[in-house]
């Protein structure tokens, strides 16, 4: 968690301040990686570039062509950075605006005209064979209808080219179904994977971001009728909505949720194949920051999934068809690298949350357009901000050849990442972490939700001791208000890195041999029997989390507690699982949400795996009233073995792992530890929680005892070294 830190427009000065209560000694976050442990969620364990490394574009767009710095921009960008095509809203809308009305059925598109235009479009595409090679980059493509002229309710607008209005949602759906039948397939473009009924219908119709009283009923009904009409023409299309611009559930003490998103699930949920959202950080809005990244986006997913489980009995996938940052305070300014920084910072932070739920995310598309010349503001002489490309002489003048904006650095950073997801763990919730293994390559991704530089201790464990031949460190950060990727190469293991404020780092490890993955961590979420419960002071709120499967002897669990409360109210309740009180952390992902109307976030509470049973009770009690518990979810990780504890026989001089110590807690003044026989010069050090060194001594092999009877009660850290090389560490408690 970080406290509020306003993004500055002209100069940015980041100060090294460690604020997280969960950080280790010396204010360091620690990241642990098990290279041999596969992390499986919903049967998925691979990094799917087709859903994460995307752009809001189609390969047929003319904007790829022109006076570019490279002769073939499609190839340079899509193939060069291994990027996939995300979304198209233009073709379906342009064609409706120029479609003839059916003379015998006023308000309906002429089927014959749809057929003829479809044939022409397919034949035109078939003739452009240079575009066909990119079909493999749109296997997860999204097509969306724009609000106008598709919307048939209040504020309806006629088609621009032909001047007639659609008669009803059924007329809208019939056109869309016929459009996909005639314009795609055969010698045309591949049929898109995901169809959004309409783009952001509530944005202008229901009072904006802060409104919570207007109802989504008409929009929900529209989705039902359109979906039914599409399926009459083509029952195989995947249809979703409502393409929400601001899924701010907590507004109005959750009245916005009740009047909009809950209502949409109730009315249209059974008709939707997926949910469609737009998720943005607002890092500069009236001199303030309104950030969704971190605990807020976690709570948003958790609440929506929880209610879907209660209402529908299952979750549905999400198409995040736009995401990133809206940079309001820069709207009257030209291009700048700093504005691009605000976007890629949000893009990385949000995508890390998406990657944690691979079974739920069908597609995630940052709102980056190729050139967006259609959005040039002629009144202000300003280009559209959300662009991959810019004129070389911007911002001074809109002249020169087309070159990349600094948004390309996101794609440059991620260009090599692929493989099997492996087990990772961070001691600081503000350090997002993920990792993948592909053959002899390992990719460790670190993202900083803090507004301060953070030192991270790395614990990268390779069970079979395959030696490291190379580490490429790539650090996407801000330097003098410019987005940069700092690169550094190492020929052996590194133990710490400095991660810049709001920055992302990818460490690409190369090993001498292919890595063996022979253990698993299988993740599953279990939802309580109720949600959105009001908070009354000193009154426990009871939840049942049933049918939990513990399929292993070893594992971990996290109680995900969604909270919506006014600022100043407690975020640290008394929580009991099966009548046993658990420790609620003071930290959560991201900042304190001070500029938001209220706090809405997920508090992640570690729960002992041994405490879980098949059917569980959870009690939540606050000292003060108001607000709601929005969701209660038990996140369970079943391990194939004890992956958190290192056997003495597995320790080598290159390992950094949890040590075997006993007893813990220490009650008799003596701490016992096992020293691996392979160590040549074992040294043990004990630190307190402030990072002060209390004792450091050479050790003998075999079972060894360290007297700690002179230490006060509390939490300490034991660190074992072999000479100057750190081998492992363990926390222990003195009672």
Curated annotation (Swiss-Prot):
Uppermost EC category: hydrolase
Signal peptide: 1-27
Superkingdom of source: Bacteria
Keyword tags: Carbohydrate metabolism, Glycosidase, Hydrolase, Signal
Enzyme Commission (EC) number: 3.2.1.222, 3.2.1.81
Record function comment: Endohydrolase that cleaves the beta-1,4 glycosidic bond between beta-D-galactopyranose-6-sulfate (G6S) and 3,6-anhydro-alpha-L-galactopyranose (LA) unit of funoran, a polysaccharide produced by red algae of the genus Gloiopeltis. It releases the disaccharide LA-G6S as the predominant end product. Also acts as a random endo-acting beta-agarase, which can hydrolyze agarose tetrasaccharides and hexasaccharides, and produces disaccharides as smallest products. Besides typical agarose oligosaccharides, it can use methylated galactoses.
Name this polypeptide is given: Funoran endo-beta-hydrolase
Annotated source species: Wenyingzhuangia aestuarii
The encoding gene: aga86A
């Amino acid at each position: 968690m970080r406290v509020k830190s306003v993004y500055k427009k002209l100069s940015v000065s980041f100060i090294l301040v460690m604020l997280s209560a969960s950080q280790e000694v010396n204010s360091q976050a620690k990241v642990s990686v098990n290279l041999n442990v596969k992390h499986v969620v919903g049967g998925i364990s691979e990094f799917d570039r087709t859903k994460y490394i995307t752009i809001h574009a189609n390969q047929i767009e003319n904007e790829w062509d022109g006076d570019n710095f490279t002769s073939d921009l499609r190839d340079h960008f899509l193939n060069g950075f291994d990027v996939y095509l995300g979304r198209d809203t233009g073709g379906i809308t342009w064609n409706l605006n120029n479609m003839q009305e059916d003379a015998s059925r006023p308000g309906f598109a002429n089927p014959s005209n749809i057929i003829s235009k479809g044939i022409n479009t397919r034949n035109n595409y078939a003739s452009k064979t240079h575009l066909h090679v990119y079909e493999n980059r749109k296997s997860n493509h999204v097509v969306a209808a724009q609000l106008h002229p598709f919307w048939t309710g209040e504020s309806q607008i006629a088609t621009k080219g032909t001047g007639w209005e659609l008669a009803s949602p059924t007329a809208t759906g019939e056109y869309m179904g016929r459009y996909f039948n005639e314009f795609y397939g055969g010698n045309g473009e591949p049929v898109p994977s995901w169809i959004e009924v309409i783009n952001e219908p509530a944005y202008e119709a229901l009072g904006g971001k802060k409104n919570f009283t207007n109802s989504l009923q008409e929009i929900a009904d529209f989705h039902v009728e359109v979906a039914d009409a599409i399926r009459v023409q083509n029952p195989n299309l995947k249809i979703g909505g409502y393409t929400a611009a601001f899924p701010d559930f907590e507004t109005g003490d959750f009245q916005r949720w009740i009047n909009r998103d809950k209502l949409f699930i109730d009315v249209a949920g059974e008709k939707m194949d997926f949910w469609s959202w737009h998720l943005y950080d607002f890092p500069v809005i009236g001199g303030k920051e309104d950030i969704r990244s971190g605990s807020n986006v976690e709570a948003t997913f958790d609440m929506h999934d929880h209610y879907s489980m209660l209402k529908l009995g299952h979750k549905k996938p999400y198409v995040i068809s736009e995401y990133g940052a809206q940079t309001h305070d820069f709207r009257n300014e030209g291009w700048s690298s700093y504005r691009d920084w605000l976007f890629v910072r949000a893009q990385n932070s949000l995508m890390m949350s998406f990657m944690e739920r691979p079974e739920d995310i069908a597609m995630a598309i940052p709102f980056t357009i190729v050139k967006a010349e259609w959005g040039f503001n002629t009144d202000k002489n300003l280009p559209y901000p959300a662009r991959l490309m810019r004129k070389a002489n911007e911002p001074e003048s809109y002249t020169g050849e087309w070159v990349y904006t600094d948004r390309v650095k996101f794609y440059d950073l991620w260009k090599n990442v692929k493989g099997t997801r492996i087990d990772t763990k961070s001691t600081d919730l503000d350090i997002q972490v993920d990792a993948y293994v592909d053959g002899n390559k390992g990719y460790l991704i670190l993202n900083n939700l803090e507004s301060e530089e953070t030192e991270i201790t790395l614990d990268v464990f390779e069970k079979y001791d395959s030696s490291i031949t190379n580490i490429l460190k790539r650090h996407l950060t801000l330097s003098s208000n410019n987005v940069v990727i700092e690169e550094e190469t190492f020929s052996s293991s590194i133990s710490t890195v400095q991660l810049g404020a709001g920055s992302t780092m990818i460490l690409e490890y190369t090993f001498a041999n292919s890595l063996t993955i022979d253990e698993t961590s299988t993740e599953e979420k279990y939802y309580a029997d109720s949600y959105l419960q009001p908070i009354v002071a000193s009154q426990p709120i009871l939840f049942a989390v049933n049918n939990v499967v513990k399929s292993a002897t070893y594992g971990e669990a996290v109680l995900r507690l969604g909270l919506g409360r006014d600022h100043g109210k407690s975020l640290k309740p008394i929580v009991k699982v099966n009548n046993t009180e658990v420790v609620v952390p003071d930290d959560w992902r991201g900042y304190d949400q001070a500029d938001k109307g209220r706090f809405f976030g997920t508090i992640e509470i570690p729960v002992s795996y041994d405490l879980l049973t098949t059917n569980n009770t959870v009690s939540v009690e606050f000292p003060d009233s108001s607000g709601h518990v929005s969701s209660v979810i038990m996140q369970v990780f079943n391990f194939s073995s004890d992956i958190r504890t290192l056997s003495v026989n597995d320790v080598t001089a290159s390992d950094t792992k949890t040590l075997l110590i006993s007893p813990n807690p220490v009650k008799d003044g003596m701490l016992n530890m096992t020293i691996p026989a392979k160590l040549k010069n074992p040294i043990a050090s004990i630190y307190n929680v402030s990072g002060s060194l209390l004792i450091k001594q050479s050790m003998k092999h075999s079972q060894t005892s360290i007297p700690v009877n002179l230490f006060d009660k509390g939490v300490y850290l034991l660190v074992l070294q072999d000479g100057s090389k750190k081998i492992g560490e363990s926390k222990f408690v003195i009672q």
